[in-house]
From Swiss-Prot:
Domain of life: Eukaryota
Subunit structure: Heterodimer of an alpha chain and a beta chain. Beta-2-microglobulin is the beta-chain of major histocompatibility complex class I molecules.
Keywords (A to Z) from UniProt: Disulfide bond, Immunity, Immunoglobulin domain, MHC I, Secreted, Signal
Gene3D superfamilies, per database record: Immunoglobulins
Biological source species: Cyprinus carpio (Common carp)
The protein's name: Beta-2-microglobulin
Cysteine-cysteine disulfides: 44-99
Family: Belongs to the beta-2-microglobulin family.
Domain Ig-like C1-type: 24-110
Amino acid sequence: MRAIITFALFCVLYVTVQGKTSSPKVQVYSHFPGEYGKENTLICHVSGFHPPDITIELLKDGEILPNTQQTDLAFEKGWQFHLTKSVTFKPERGQNYACSVRHMNNKNIYSWEPNM
């Protein structure tokens, strides 16, 4: 009987957790202040999302940047997840750098603001 109650509680918890959808919060920034022609790291940190069905791409003028690195998917309290993707780059004047995030059926693009 105890096993049945435990299983039932597990099922209720599973359904409750699976039923909550949270949109991602996205931050796009660089490791150092942006300076044209100087090597830097472009970072896209995505947090607070559920379920963990997500794709992150770093872009230069709409094209996917190669040689990116991605952290392992991790979760926070409340079963919300976070993930970070980064790449080494040299900002060029007139180029647009961005992070594309697809979560579930929603896709958004977030631009990097170099503050130069």
